[in-house]
Amino acid sequence: MSQNLFNVEDYRKLRQKRLPKMVYDYLEGGAEDEYGVKHNRDVFQQWRFKPKRLVDVSRRSLQAEVLGKRQSMPLLIGPTGLNGALWPKGDLALARAATKAGIPFVLSTASNMSIEDLARQCDGDLWFQLYVIHREIAQGMVLKALHTGYTTLVLTTDVAVNGYRERDLHNRFKIPMSYSAKVVLDGCLHPRWSLDFVRHGMPQLANFVSSQTSSLEMQAALMSRQMDASFNWEALRWLRDLWPHKLLVKGLLSAEDADRCIAEGADGVILSNHGGRQLDCAISPMEVLAQSVAKTGKPVLIDSGFRRGSDIVKALALGAEAVLLGRATLYGLAARGETGVDEVLTLLKADIDRTLAQIGCPDITSLSPDYLQNEGVTNTAPVDHLIGKGTHA
């Protein structure tokens, strides 16, 4: 472990030093006033631990089944786009780190490495995330994932339109990046990132590359045109018929939607508010977790805001089958590449293990709401307190 890197926040600070402001803000920022990203962190304080004493915790197990497969711990590295802007071949670095840790990696539709290239270079448990895009393009991607060995398909449902991210607007961030004097100066102030950028070139939206979309600008335009705001329950049934393996629906924030997805053939759901990047002031998925678990009776996974092992333990105690990591592992990637991701996963694993010992639960599969007390109150500190201080989801 690197000196003075003791938690996820330390990696965020190191990442901030390495990245140009517009790249940092793109991945750190949220929608509009960013109340949602703040709430994603504050919400964990609603639950306090109720430890059980005089329990033998000399031996502890973090192993658990996720969708019927035994894993080293109930975590995944979730889907995030443009990882190549953080570190060269960022998708591959994340996937390899996940494989070494014994957990799945979810490749994004907006990845900088194609579905088939990642499958050729990584032999881990690969999942593929699909946006609500028009069926012709969606079918091609799904069949590529099927034929190259991806085990699970994740449909993201909360991006019918893009979130209004004002940091990006202020920075004039777009794909491809424009080379204004401000951007060039920012790059000069971050030479390590700029040198990587010069050596490896502009990352491509690899799943949208074709003979007609040779430039990144054309790929971004194609992806934008393919977003399908009419995608509905009938389209979900079409996707269910197309994909023969495990199917999860992501982006849900109600127990009723979760139950409907199961009724339509999904094998499970992922509660998510997209890390606060889509709808500002949306509820946290933690606030509907227990109800969704009770209503569906099927695997319920969750993301948005997880930074500590104690956050993860709280979600598991409320019934989540697993937690997906987003910014947490991206901080490690941006700071130190694949090594940084390895280190963040090691930190979180140790944090989970320590929390289990402290609450008197030697086996992670034995977690239950009995270990928690709901305080029902969140931190009401003003949003200005967190801007630029790394408390975003």
Curated annotation (Swiss-Prot):
Q: What Enzyme Commission number(s) apply to this enzyme?
A: 1.1.99.31
Gene3D superfamilies for the chain: Aldolase class I (3.20.20.70)
User: Which pathway does UniProt place it in?
Assistant: Aromatic compound metabolism; (R)-mandelate degradation; benzoate from (R)-mandelate: step 2/4
The answer, when asked if Oxidoreductase is one of the entry's keywords, is: yes
Q: Which domain of life is it from?
A: Bacteria
Question: Which amino acid positions bind (S)-mandelate, per UniProt?
Answer: Y26, Y131, R165, H274, R277
Keywords, comma-separated and alphabetical? Aromatic hydrocarbons catabolism, Cell inner membrane, Cell membrane, Flavoprotein, FMN, Mandelate pathway, Membrane, Oxidoreductase
- Could you give one GO CC term from the UniProt record? plasma membrane
For FMN, which residues are the binding ones?
P79, T80, G81, S108, Q129, T156, K250, D303, S304, G305, F306, R307, G326, R327
The regions listed as transmembrane in this protein's record are none
Where the record annotates domain FMN hydroxy acid dehydrogenase, the positions are 1-377
Annotated active site: H274
**What is the annotated quaternary arrangement, including any partners?**
Homotetramer.
Q: Which family does it belong to?
A: Belongs to the FMN-dependent alpha-hydroxy acid dehydrogenase family.
Q: What is this protein called?
A: (S)-mandelate dehydrogenase
Gene coding for it: mdlB
